Amino acid sequence: MQTALLKPKIIAVEPLGDHHAKVVMEPFERGYGHTLGNALRRVLLSSMVGYAPTEVTIAGVVHEYSTIDGVQEDVVNLLLNLKGVVFKLHNRDEVTVSLRKDGEGIVTAADIELPHDVEIINPNHVIAHLSAGGKLDMQIKVEQGRGYVPGNVRKFGDESSKVIGRIVLDASFSPVRRVSYAVESARVEQRTDLDKLVMNIETDGVISPEEAIRQSARILVDQLSVFAALEGTESAAEAASSRAPQIDPILLRPVDDLELTVRSANCLKAENIYYIGDLIQRTENELLKTPNLGRKSLNEIKEVLASRGLTLGMKLENWPPAGLDK
């Protein structure tokens, strides 16, 4: 009797529009379509890294319930429009940008002054309408994050939010706008009881639907890897004789699994950093002393580690473990 579980062999991506695609995977054993589809959907909606405006300072405005002379929108609607601007930061976690415009006309996202490593995905997005003599002068803080973070959460923990005139925003960081899935019937040879998983994904353009699927799958694999390494319960005598700290299996993976750029990966290997466990024990200052590894590569490494719940400068006991090849 065959006991091996089927793995999907067909993965098709059908574009449905800008930043919108249908991803089809088959065949799955019966029931696995719903099991994996629901898990992927929840991760896609909650755990993708994105960018959002988190704080705003507007010249002449003390609080969000104000109005601005010469601006059609009140401050509440102005902030709602601002939340619709899709930012993408390269090799940085936060940035403060400026928006200054006067005179009659429409204010769009393209009017925001950006540094070279920040881009706006939807530059035609309308922020406000100015009448003759109207003027708008704003400072906008944009940060990287996950999921949805209410503004009042940061108000209690951030002293900077107490500055008069600084408005703290609710931040929706997720780059995934909508996700749905359906499970249909699939057939392989004589078997007709198999599942086909169809996922419909729409993003804001910061990442593609295909990349969103890849990232969500990696997150699930990382979270489940600890269960794959689970061992049976030890007896009291065995527990007493094996008190060495257990090592997270993620740390035993080669740095190649982080999918860094070729430049960053080669710099790490030149310093004999072959495993993720080797990497996280290095500090930022130590890595910056590595030949050809600059601030851009360092930020890339920090971002990739953060997506896996890791940071630089961590301390590990019992490293390297016995039998680890270099």
From Swiss-Prot:
Pfam families: RNA_pol_A_bac, RNA_pol_A_CTD, RNA_pol_L. Homodimer. The RNAP catalytic core consists of 2 alpha, 1 beta, 1 beta' and 1 omega subunit. When a sigma factor is associated with the core the holoenzyme is formed, which can initiate transcription. Disulfide bonds: none annotated. One of its GO terms (cellular component) is DNA-directed RNA polymerase complex. InterPro entries: DNA-dir_RNA_pol_insert, DNA-dir_RNA_pol_RpoA/D/Rpb3, DNA-dir_RpoA, RBP11-like, RNAP_asu_C, RNApol_insert_sf. CDD domains: RNAP_alpha_NTD. The lineage of its organism: Bacteria, Pseudomonadati, Pseudomonadota, Betaproteobacteria, Burkholderiales. This is DNA-directed RNA polymerase subunit alpha. Residues 247-326 are annotated as: Alpha C-terminal domain (alpha-CTD). It catalyses: RNA(n) + a ribonucleoside 5'-triphosphate = RNA(n+1) + diphosphate. One of its GO terms (molecular function) is DNA-directed RNA polymerase activity.
